[in-house]
């Protein structure tokens, strides 16, 4: 479901950028490029940045998306993976598997609620402002959508794995370029995609 959510996040960002950008025709090209895709494979570069470490850990891998509910990213010959399968988010680090539960799963659920609301024409849907703060910025040909889940419980907020998600789209080339998962402090994991 993580990859499905990434795909939905991507489509949402396109729709939001379409509404806010003067280059609506270019945004429509991005949406058209990915519309109706049943399978998608891309090269992905994962950059793990930790403020206390001098150098970032950079790893090349693959991103695979299969409709309707399966997607995964794999690195280090399968020792590191991020898997979304029918609403279950699994992370594998150095061969150790952990399934997102509790606060971490709730963060992904908030992200999914935001995305569903953006894509839904249902007027009874939950107000996005109740579950997340969103900000859209544009610099040159890049459009970035930042989604920050609203977690009112102070204890739960301290246990959050990610503080926000940033999706980047290249409007000129009509491509989904990256996803950044911001962590506490100045730490983050960046996924940069290419064909």
Predicted regions located by residue number:
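Bacterial N-terminal signal peptides that target proteins for export
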Residues: 1-10
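Bacterial N-terminal signal peptides
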Residues: 9-18
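Boundary at the C-terminal end of the N-terminal hydrophobic targeting segment
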Residues: 20-24
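Flexible, processing/modification-adjacent segments and terminal tails
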Residues: 25-43, 48-49, 55-56, 92-153, ...
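Low-complexity, intrinsically disordered segments exposed to solvent
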Residues: 58-60
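An acidic-aromatic
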Residues: 62-113, 189
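Gly/Pro-enriched, hydrophobic low-complexity segments
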Residues: 126-195
